[in-house]
Amino acid sequence: MEDTVKITAEELKGYIERIEKLEQEKRDVQDHIRDVYAKATDEGWDIKVMKQIIRLRKMDDDDREEQEILLDTYKRALGMSYEEELSE
């Protein structure tokens, strides 16, 4: 029984250490991402728009198209459509 507990404890410790290592790697990657955003900001890029583009690129094509159609529908309903401004 004691051997089983020892093996289980070692296995648990291994999982914990792997998770801790991955958490550190995740923090490092997040730091790198912040650096890229900072550099883009310094060069005049709009970070909010970049983040929106990244979010859209993660979506599958059908979901993205559906969201864009809904957004356009809502904007037109509120008189915010660019096309409506052009036709006036």
UniProtKB/Swiss-Prot annotation:
It comes from the Bacteria. Pfam families: GapR_DNA-bd. GO terms for molecular function: DNA binding. Belongs to the UPF0335 family. This is UPF0335 protein WRi_003770. It comes from Wolbachia sp. subsp. Drosophila simulans (strain wRi).
